[in-house]
Amino acid sequence: DRKPQATAIDVIVLGSGVYDQVKHYGRVMGVNVSEKPSNRPEMFARMRDELWWKLREAFQERTIKIPNDDELIGELNLVKFNFARTGSEKLKVEGKRELRDRGVASPNKADAVVLSEYAINRTAMRSYVDWRRHGLRRGSLSWKVA
């Protein structure tokens, strides 16, 4: 049995209750993807947009590997980027409503990968010493989307 050393939970709607129930178990991060982006606010409309873009960059840089899962790969390829409707130059990933309008189900597995990358990067930022002390690595992180 492998226990995750960090878990990221989307705290919007259903995830909020899940987070409240499990946060006392250890390294659990609540993530509100509708908040402002943490980096480059001039480039992204919301944190969700930033996190999806960072995942895109990780694939381009070949710094991430995923399971050979047709459903996951399909979900990752379905979501589109565009510019925010405000007329700004900010990038925005296609929202859940827009996906539904296209007849596409919510990309739950892909969202989970996005959150796991967030957990990895956030944990790594704490410090190299902390990283080494806790022995965190990509394979030891879990992801859930409620």
Model feature map: region roles:
Residues 67-133:
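Charge-patterned, long linear interaction tracts outside catalytic cores
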Residues 1-90, 134-146:
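Mg2+-dependent endonuclease catalytic cores in nucleic-acid-processing enzymes, primarily RNase H-like
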